[in-house]
C-alpha cells in the first residue's frame, strides 16, 4: 500500500488499489475459460455493468478478439514499439465509438523506453518498475552508552 501511495504522491495514477476495483483477465484465466470472448463474457456476468473488465493480451490477434468481445480496457503486454503503435491504432479505430477501448502498454517498460512508448499512441503506460523495483531506505538507530 505504501508503494501505491508513493506513486500517487509523485503524481502517478494507480492502476488498481485492490482486486475489487476492476477485473483483470490474464493468461491463466484465458486457459481456464477457453477463449477471450468467453472470459470477457463470464467476467461481465459476474461483476455487472459498473465494474470495468480489462484483459491482458500479448499479440495483435488477441487484441482483435478482445475488442470484438467488448473489453473496456486492454493491457498490451510485452509488445515492441511498432506493435504498440499498431495496437493503439486498432483500439481507437476498430470499435463502435473511437476511444471507447482504453489501451495501456505494460511489461518491460523502464525509464529508458518510456518516451518512445508514450509516442505510440497508447492511452496509458503501466510502470511496475515504480513499485516492484524500488529500493528500501536503509534506516538505522544506534544507541550511544
Locate predicted features.
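Intrinsic disorder/low-complexity segments
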Residues: 94-100
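A short, gly/pro- and small-residue-rich
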Residues: 141-145
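Extended hydrophobic secondary-structure segments
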Residues: 73-81
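Acidic/glycine-rich phosphate/pyrophosphate-binding loops and surrounding catalytic core
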Residues: 1-69, 73, 85-90, 101-104, ...
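Short secondary-structure boundary segments
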Residues: 78, 107, 129-130
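Low-complexity, compositionally biased segments
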Residues: 80-84, 95
Amino acid at each position: 500500500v505504501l508503494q501505491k501511495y508513493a506513486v500517487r504522491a509523485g503524481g502517478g495514477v494507480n492502476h488498481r488499489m485492490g482486486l475489487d476495483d476492476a477485473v483483470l483477465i490474464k493468461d491463466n484465466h484465458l486457459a481456464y475459460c477457453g477463449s477471450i470472448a468467453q472470459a470477457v463474457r463470464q467476467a461481465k456476468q459476474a461483476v455487472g455493468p459498473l465494474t470495468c473488465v480489462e484483459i491482458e493480451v500479448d499479440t495483435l490477434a488477441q487484441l482483435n478478439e478482445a475488442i470484438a468481445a467488448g473489453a473496456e480496457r486492454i493491457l498490451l503486454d510485452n509488445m515492441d514499439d511498432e506493435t504498440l503503435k499498431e495496437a493503439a491504432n486498432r483500439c481507437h479505430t476498430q470499435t463502435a465509438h473511437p476511444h471507447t477501448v482504453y489501451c495501456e502498454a505494460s511489461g518491460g517498460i523502464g525509464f529508458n523506453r518510456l518516451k518512445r512508448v508514450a509516442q505510440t499512441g497508447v492511452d496509458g503506460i503501466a510502470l511496475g518498475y515504480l513499485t516492484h523495483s524500488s529500493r528500501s531506505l536503509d534506516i538505522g538507530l544506534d544507541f550511544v552508552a
